[in-house]
Swiss-Prot record:
Biological processes annotated in GO: rRNA processing
GO MF term set: RNA binding
Residue segments, region Disordered: 1-32, 53-151, 196-228, 395-543, 555-619
Ranges of biased composition (kind: Basic and acidic residues): 8-26, 67-82, 92-106, 196-212, 448-461, 469-486, 525-543
Protein family membership: Belongs to the ESF1 family.
Coiled coil: 418-476
Organism of derivation: Eremothecium gossypii (strain ATCC 10895 / CBS 109.51 / FGSC 9923 / NRRL Y-1056) (Yeast)
Annotated protein name in UniProt: Pre-rRNA-processing protein ESF1
Intracellular or extracellular location(s): Nucleus, Nucleolus
GO CC entries: nucleolus; small-subunit processome
Start-end of Polar residues biased regions: 497-506
Gene giving rise to this polypeptide: ESF1
């Protein structure tokens, strides 16, 4: 049903539907009339909905979110006592509304002006307290006046746990005009930050950050259920931090430091101020808050860090400040610095280790260690003093009788040298130790390179000597062969002239190598290894007839003792030839004997036939 006008009066409604306003059939029922009314007959235990455990199966406390049973109970049931109390309050409101103030009638809770003033003061105090506890802490919205422009800028309210001088220098260099330059950037601790950091070194974060015992007890007494899925989504299911106090503390940490940007002129500072003030630094939720520093203001505090140029290996740090953009704030008081974590994960080269400043990552010595060092130094001095003697007596001995004697001082250089070495070793820091080890490693490497060079030169010399030696060996071998031939020619006949000479006339290994080389292709043959074998066996010698004919002297080429030489090939060939001749000769004799036997058999058969014929009777 569309309405012609936006008014709610009866005149604006169509006359055809005017009955809807007065007819009770079209009146919507009230929500409280739909609920089931419960009287006093129902006890508290009967009305009590199902209770759940206070802790989960892991022992963690369950949160206080209202359960489904409680919501259903409030939706469908109501008690008559609560309903009657609500009706009485409605009647009182109506009676108060009917009071005639012109006749001097006043409500029962009327308060005089004097009482109202005193009560208003107390209420204002309580309201301020509650408002102060409930309000969310924010960075100051009303920024002070910028003042006269100067060439020095101050940067405040940033996450100084992650923001470094190099980050600010890179960000501001993008807005430097032509001819402008940023001389340096320094980060100083504020007075507020020094006081708070000094307190945190002893006490840690303020106690307001943590929940009070009353709040914890109230949490423990709560019986409302929470689903197992919600429990896993929440993680620990309960945190010991007060979220508002923690947010306030994290925002206060932004004021622990401030940065000072030194520009070469006022125009550069103005350009940076106009372009960067109020803008977000990357996507970290940190807004640049810039202020002009008046001329002549000096900073006596020692800066946390300084930067005049962008490092070569600069890499921006990816971070976000949870207190500025998240509902769940993270406590960063004991968080490990990001650059230290990155340094622990990286694998540095040797050059980076030498150039690194380890003092930024090493903790300072405590007073106790300094006291121990002082006591050790005193003991060393005392031992050195006691070693000085005069006439075989200690120089500083307590003697009442002073006797004149020739002064003779004895020193112990060995002890002094040892003590000095120990002092040098103790005074050497980590960086010097690394440099010393690197020098030793380089020295060893150079010595090793020298040794390798010497070995290479010696090998070259030895190879040259071997070449000359190989030539001389071949010449010497030829001379030895000639000498052996002469010895054989000049050898006298003696008793053992018929036996084999002790100096053999051939070398089987040389013959085998020569045969192997002959089997290769001509381009791969080594001519110096080929030996001309002039030995020719006498195959017709009757003394060696059985070697070629008797099977007891058969030669098996598959045996490993077989040596395939030219003479051996001739012997095998002769043996095959003779074996084939003997086989053919034997075959002929066998054929002749067979033919003779056949002829003799025929003759005997003829004689037997004639005898049989002669024995037959005549008719």
């Amino acid at each position: 049903m569309a309405k012609n006008n936006e008014g709610t009066g009866k005149d604006s409604i169509d006359k055809r539907f005017a009955r809807i306003e007065s007819d009770p059939k079209f009146r919507a029922p009230k929500q409280k009339n739909l609920k089931i009314k419960l009287d006093d007959r129902f006890s508290k235990q009967d009305l009590e909905y199902k209770r759940k455990a206070k802790v989960d199966k892991y022992g963690r406390r369950i949160g206080t979110a209202p359960g489904k049973e409680e919501k259903d109970f409030e939706k469908y049931f109501t008690k008559e006592s609560s309903e009657s109390a609500a009706e009485e309050s409605d009647k009182e409101d109506s009676s108060v509304a009917k009071l005639d103030r012109a006749r001097g009638e006043v409500p029962a809770d009327y308060v005089s002006s004097s009482d109202e003033e005193s009560s208003s003061e107390s209420e204002a105090d309580s309201d301020d307290a509650t408002a102060e506890s409930d309000e969310e802490v924010e960075i100051e919205e009303e920024k002070p006046e910028s003042g006269d422009p100067s060439k020095v800028l101050a940067v405040v309210n940033l996450d100084w746990d992650h923001v470094k001088c190099a980050d600010l220098l890179v960000a501001f260099n993008s807005f430097v005009p032509e001819g402008g330059k940023i001389e340096r950037v320094a980060i100083y601790p504020s007075e507020f930050g020094k006081e708070r950091m000094q307190r945190e070194e002893v006490e840690g974060p303020p106690r307001e950050v943590f929940k009070s015992k009353k709040d914890k007890k109230a949490k423990q007494d709560d019986d409302d259920e929470i689903g197992l899925k919600d429990l896993y989504e929440q993680g620990d299911a309960e945190k010991d931090y007060d979220s508002k106090a923690l947010r306030r503390y994290q925002l206060e940490r932004l004021r622990y430091y401030y940065a000072v940007v030194y520009c070469n002129n006022v125009a550069t500072a103005e350009a940076i101020y106009q372009n960067c003030d109020g803008t977000e630094y990357e996507s970290t939720a940190n807004m640049f808050d810039l202020r002009y520093v008046p001329e002549g203001v000096t900073f006596d505090d020692e800066p946390r860090e300084e930067c005049a140029s962008v490092p070569k290996d600069y890499k921006p740090v990816q971070f976000s400040t949870s207190a500025l953009q998240h509902s769940q704030v993270k406590l960063t008081w004991d968080e490990t610095p990001a650059d230290r974590v990155e340094m622990a994960k990286r694998a540095f080269s040797q050059k980076e280790i030498e150039d690194m400043d380890f003092k930024a990552y090493l903790a300072s010595d405590s007073e106790e260690s300094e006291a121990d060092d002082n006591s050790e130094a005193k003991n060393k001095l005392r031992s050195l003093v006691s070693s000085v003697k005069v006439a075989d007596k200690p120089l500083f001995a307590d003697e009442s009788d002073e006797e004149e004697a020739d002064v003779q001082i004895t020193f112990t250089p060995g002890l002094e040298g040892g003590e000095a070495k120990e002092e040098d070793a103790e005074e050497e820091n980590i960086l010097e130790k690394l440099k010393r080890k690197e020098k030793e490693r380089r020295k060893k490497r150079k010595e090793r390179v020298k040794e390798l060079k010497k070995q290479a030169e010696e090998e070259k010399k030895s190879s040259k000597k071997e070449k000359h030696a190989s030539k001389s060996e071949s010449e010497q071998k030829s001379e030895n062969d000639k000498r052996a031939e002469l010895e054989l020619l000049m050898m006298e006949d003696d008793e053992n002239s018929q036996s084999i000479n002790s100096s053999a006339h051939f070398n089987m290994n040389d013959i085998l190598r020569s045969e192997k080389e002959r089997g290769k292709k001509s381009k791969y043959q080594k001519k110096d290894k080929i030996v001309e074998d002039d030995f020719k066996p006498d195959l017709n010698d009757p003394r060696f007839k059985e070697v070629f004919e008797d099977r007891d002297f058969a030669i098996d080429p598959s045996q490993p003792e077989f040596k395939e030489t030219a003479a051996m090939k001739q012997i095998l060939q002769e043996r095959r030839k003779r074996s084939s001749k003997s086989a053919s000769k034997k075959r002929k004799t066998d054929e002749q004997s067979d033919s003779a036997m056949d002829s003799a058999g025929d003759l005997k058969g003829l004689v037997a036939k004639l005898k049989r014929k002669g024995k037959k009777p005549k008719l």
